[in-house]
Amino acid sequence: MGSDFYLRYYVGHKGKFGHEFLEFEFRPDGKLRYANNSNYKNDVMIRKEAYVHKSVMEELKRIIDDSEVTKEDDALWPPPDRVGRQELEIVIGDEHISFTTSKIGSLIDVNQSKDPEGLRVFYYLVQDLKCLVFSLIGLHFKIKPI
């Protein structure tokens, strides 16, 4: 699968229920690591690990390439605050990018930022990545073998 690809995403905050977060990463060898921590109603941390096929890794690269997020800069994005923070780190080929911003509640937050075009690219990419990861985790851990 090559060592030219890595992705990590984190979103979280520290509040009345402690440190609540969602984090996932795809490693160069195809390992998907997922963690979801919510202390709401004494919930426990969910940790899952699975290996994904190289075709999934290729699709992930395609999604990132199509988004053109590697052309963006987070300098004008809202900084992390008491509401929370998001981090996205991607290594793809020779490029290594890292973004940090506050939690984004909706497109209204995006449109009111100092860089709505760039933040919109980030926002939609994160939505796509979360959807893919939730689907992979759900399918991998809920399917019953025959």
UniProtKB/Swiss-Prot annotation:
Listed CDD domains: Mago_nashi (cd11295)
Transmembrane segment boundaries: none
Keyword RNA-binding: yes
GO biological process: mRNA processing; mRNA transport; RNA splicing
Top-level taxon: Eukaryota
Principal location class: nucleus
Localization terms from the record: Nucleus; Nucleus speckle; Cytoplasm
Coiled coil: none
Gene3D superfamilies: Mago nashi (3.30.1560.10)
Record PANTHER family: MAGO HOMOLOG, EXON JUNCTION COMPLEX SUBUNIT-RELATED, PROTEIN MAGO NASHI HOMOLOG
Function: Core component of the splicing-dependent multiprotein exon junction complex (EJC) deposited at splice junctions on mRNAs. The EJC is a dynamic structure consisting of core proteins and several peripheral nuclear and cytoplasmic associated factors that join the complex only transiently either during EJC assembly or during subsequent mRNA metabolism.
Subunit field text: Part of the EJC core complex that contains casc3, eif4a3, magoh and rbm8a.
Protein's name according to its UniProt entry: Protein mago nashi homolog
